[in-house]
Amino acid sequence: MESEDERRGRFRYQPCLWLHPGIALCGFTLFLLNFVSCCCAATVTLLPVVDTTLIETEPTNNLGGALFVNAGVTQNFTKNHGLFRFDLAGQIPPHSQLTRADLILEVTHIPRDGYASAEFGLHRLLVSWGEGNKVADDPSHPGLGSPATTNEATWNDRFAFTTNHWSVPGAAPIYDYSPVVSARQTIYDVGSSPYTFESTPALVANVQSWLDNPQTNFGWLLKALSEVENFTSRRFGSREDTNHPPLLVIEFIPSLWIQQPEISGNQFRFQFAAQAGQSYRAEFRDSFSSNGWMTLTNIPAPATTTDALILDSLSSTKRFYRVVEP
């Protein structure tokens, strides 16, 4: 029996003219061998689209507009959780296979009265939240934020002044975020920055799921893995800090997916998303007992990603098509 992966990798198209339920007249059979993937991986580096801090000591405040995101435990044993979300739309071709994902963070400040090294972990968020745009009212206490307004994330709420609360203040494992640590890193001081949460199967799986199902992309929660010890709190550069922003570096293998195959008059047509800077060749053959694939058309590398339309006159009762990256 054909596996799901095999079905996804090969698309069989059989156009038929339906005259009556149960009666079909098929003049020809066409097969699309959906893609021949490039063996070379591509890399993209993304900035977060939203990030903020959940502040236990000021549970109704927001800090979404600050130059930093706080995470860890303060000297007074109060906790901070950092939230980050990256948007993959338009950055990675749909159906691409992700092979690596690294998150790079820079520590921009440590506790004034000393610090303890600590292991921090990334947890995949399971619910949505609002970034907000607040900074601290009191410049001498920049990590406390200021009172949230509607739809801004706080320690208590995913969206302030709505019914969308965290399951428990500060967010709860299982309900608000996955208890699984997707990646971890020991954090020391500013001088050891930047810190890379190196690729793991779980981290890659998080990002792959966001690519395949964008509606599940709520980002990551960053926290100290142990929230018993104090002096582990750190400020990490946020997206507003253009000198020290978080960076998500993704390595992937683009997949070429054929779209909208159809017959129009005496022509067979299909299209696919031609990636910027990549040339392609559409090929055909009428039989696998013949001498091989023949070139139908060459597609020059476009300057930007664009839909390429392939046309062929119907001159055979059976034909196979594929698109390759030379």
Regions found by a protein language model. Give the residues of each.
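Flexible, small-residue-rich N-terminal segments that precede or flank a structured functional core
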Residues: C40-I92, I110, S178, S226-E227, ...
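Proprotein-processing/basic-patch segments
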Residues: T200, V204-P254
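Residue-level detector of buried hydrophobic side-chain packing
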Residues: F86, A101-L103, L122, P201, ...
